[in-house]
Amino acid sequence: MGCLLFLLLWALLQAWGSAEVPQRLFPLRCLQISSFANSSWTRTDGLAWLGELQTHSWSNDSDTVRSLKPWSQGTFSDQQWETLQHIFRVYRSSFTRDVKEFAKMLRLSYPLELQVSAGCEVHPGNASNNFFHVAFQGKDILSFQGTSWEPTQEAPLWVNLAIQVLNQDKWTRETVQWLLNGTCPQFVSGLLESGKSELKKQVKPKAWLSRGPSPGPGRLLLVCHVSGFYPKPVWVKWMRGEQEQQGTQPGDILPNADETWYLRATLDVVAGEAAGLSCRVKHSSLEGQDIVLYWGGSYTSMGLIALAVLACLLFLLIVGFTSRFKRQTSYQGVL
């Protein structure tokens, strides 16, 4: 009986432990794409994400940042939000002017493409970190570090001259510091509070198997599709029993139109060795009840297996106690 109790306790601990979901962080990432066809034609568009959710967009044809979620303003007042948008309008105008001046000064050839990635991440305890990176023609050239601009190791030589000019602009450097160190963490904290119900949502994946194009004579390409899950982190592997198949090739995690995600994982095998293979899916929404699909059509859930084991153990425990109680009653009758 002691062994049976131990097994029951161990199984319960395993079930509870597997349901734990690690704490997620939600960085705010703002992406700016600026195109300069020549000195007179330019276009700048922007997007922003909080974690995996797109929250804002900014079209070149508009002076207003578009909110894509009901909670995209966070806890900012209307006045704070308008002030922030005014700063962005001034920034966009200044950025366009400065790039044209640098192109002339450094004799850069049009067309020019620049990308800016900036934002911050708030950690428990109100600690935060931030970033501001600039790329030219698709390659990182500089970033804002602490109180000044610094070149990347791969930056062309002319970037050093541009940085000398940028670092002389004290007002701009102080504004960037204020936005990254103060405004951004405050804004993100408000977004996390206002959008917490959507940010913490869990959507269970759906999974199915199919056969891909034949990789060669006598071989099969097994495909495991996983779709409709949120949040993005997911674990998908082809298995033989409990042994992971090292040949598993996961694809990119792609977005669905409903803000969930899709992934497929393939395995190239000899046709005669496909029997006994399965695809296992782990995701936080499943709470430890992994999806397992067997090649050939059968389906099971590791959670259901665990529940079945617990039910059997509980049944045996009840039977054991009942039997022991009857024996004790019988002994008392004899005495």
From Swiss-Prot:
Membrane-spanning regions, if any? Answer: 302-322
Topology relative to the membrane: Single-pass type I membrane protein
Instruction: Tell me what happens on changing residue 334 to A.
Output: Strongly reduced internalization
The alphabetical list of record keywords is: Cell membrane, Disulfide bond, Endoplasmic reticulum, Endosome, Glycoprotein, Immunity, Immunoglobulin domain, Innate immunity, Lysosome, Membrane, Signal, Transmembrane, Transmembrane helix
> Could you provide one GO biological process annotation from this protein's UniProt record?
antigen processing and presentation, endogenous lipid antigen via MHC class Ib
Which residues have a glycan attached per UniProt?
Answer: 38, 60, 126, 181
Disulfide bonds, which pairs?
120-184, 224-279
Major place of residence: membrane
User: Would I find Glycoprotein among this entry's keywords?
Assistant: yes
Q: Which residues form the Ig-like domain?
A: 185-292
Asked if the keyword Signal belongs to this entry, the reply reads yes
Which organs or tissues contain this protein?
A: Expressed on cortical thymocytes, on certain T-cell leukemias, and in various other tissues.
Q: Where is this motif: Internalization signal?
A: 331-334
Q: Which domain of life is it from?
A: Eukaryota
Which InterPro entries did the record assign? Ig-like_dom, Ig-like_dom_sf, Ig-like_fold, Ig_C1-set, MHC_class-I_related, MHC_I-like_Ag-recog, MHC_I-like_Ag-recog_sf, MHC_I/II-like_Ag-recog
Entry binding sites for a D-galactosylceramide = 98, 169-172
Identify the Pfam families for this entry. C1-set, MHC_I_3
Pull the Cytoplasmic topological domain ranges from the record. 323-335
Extracellular side residue ranges read 20-301
Compartments (UniProt record)? Cell membrane; Basolateral cell membrane; Endosome membrane; Lysosome membrane
GO annotation, cellular component aspect: basolateral plasma membrane; cell surface; cytoplasm; endoplasmic reticulum; endoplasmic reticulum membrane; endosome membrane; external side of plasma membrane; extracellular space
Q: Where is the signal peptide?
A: 1-19
Other facts noted in the record for this chain: During protein synthesis and maturation, CD1 family members bind endogenous lipids that are replaced by lipid or glycolipid antigens when the proteins are internalized and pass through endosomes, before trafficking back to the cell surface.
Question: Which PANTHER family does UniProt cross-reference here?
Answer: ANTIGEN-PRESENTING GLYCOPROTEIN CD1D, MHC CLASS I-RELATED
- Role noted for this protein: Antigen-presenting protein that binds self and non-self glycolipids and presents them to T-cell receptors on natural killer T-cells.
Protein name per the record = Antigen-presenting glycoprotein CD1d
> In which organism is this protein found?
Homo sapiens
The major lineage groups are:
Eukaryota, Metazoa, Chordata, Craniata, Vertebrata
